[in-house]
Amino acid sequence: MFKWCSNTYKLEYFAIIKFIFKTFLWAQKLHLQCLNGGESAMKVVILAGGFGTRLSEETHLIPKPMVEIGGRPILWHIMKCYSHYGFDDFIICGGYKCDVIKNFFNHYFLYTSDVTFDFKRKKTEFISSKAEDWRVTIVDTGLDTMTGSRVKKIQHLLNDNEPFFLTYGDGVCDLNFRDQLNFHKSHGKMATVLAVTPPGRFGSMTIEGEKVTKFIEKPQGDNCGRINGGFFIFNKPFVRYLTEDDCSLESGPLDRLACQGQLVAHEHDGFWFAMDTLRDKNKLDDLWKRGSAPWKMSDRANYQHSAKINPLRALKG
């Protein structure tokens, strides 16, 4: 029978077991990435720099993507949706109050961890953490920069010869992003846009077959058909359509792609919702509180045990 010689050996034994367990988890994740052809390394670009003026009740203190739904920023919810399908490498294009986003993620690991502060030995020990296995790059792309120019300014961070996801920091959906990626690869065009069917205050598209033949930023009237859902996949060469000055993603580059037959619609009939007003925010909050949030990926995301994080608290830390 094995006999402990001292507490030191006991501690070393548990340290070895912990190391072996972490190595196993790392190897398992690497194996899954290989099975998926390395696709989990794809970049997810999130536009998070606008002023959010229609939601000024919240955005006078924090940027719109940091407005909380169920105690967490909507930005976090969006990232959870991508992460559920194995896409964990994020580039956040900040602007207005970008420091709030940086502070949130700077403190995120601490706030989601069980931790021991040993003041006597001047040590901090993280016992366990509920933080996601994400890589998050935050770039201040300018206060007044337009959407297309924000993407242009982070082009050096994108992987060569690989498509990238792009979305806005204010909308959630129940889309299967791996299905969207497979769809994008199947048609061989420059870009894929999610096409959804809510109210007509968003950009509309004319679709023939699967190809988008016309892109209209904000149509008039109720009969506007499917609209731009704001969840895109682009091939890397798309950045050539962009400039660093006064380039709106929606009114110029997307329309050019449509005219060239390089923009394809991925039609989605599931849940989709954009948070533009306080009423929208309250609706999402209500869905969350009732436990009926369609975008919640509960089988992988441990939402129930996620501690509430107030981004304003991070500014004081």
Short names for language-model regions:
Residues 162-165, 172-173, 177-185, 197-200, ...:
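Catalytic-core segments of class I nucleotidyltransferases/pyrophosphorylases
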Residues 16, 21-41:
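Short, Lys/Arg-enriched N-terminal segments with co-localized hydrophobic residues
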Residues 7-9, 13, 31:
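Intrinsic-disorder-associated, low-complexity terminal segments enriched in Asp/Asn/His/Tyr and depleted
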Residues 44-46, 92, 166, 191-194, ...:
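Structural beta-sheet core signal
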Residues 38-103, 107, 138:
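N-terminal glycine-rich phosphate-binding loop and ensuing alpha1 helix
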Residues 100-209:
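Conserved beta-loop-beta/alpha segment of the NTase-like Rossmann-fold superfamily
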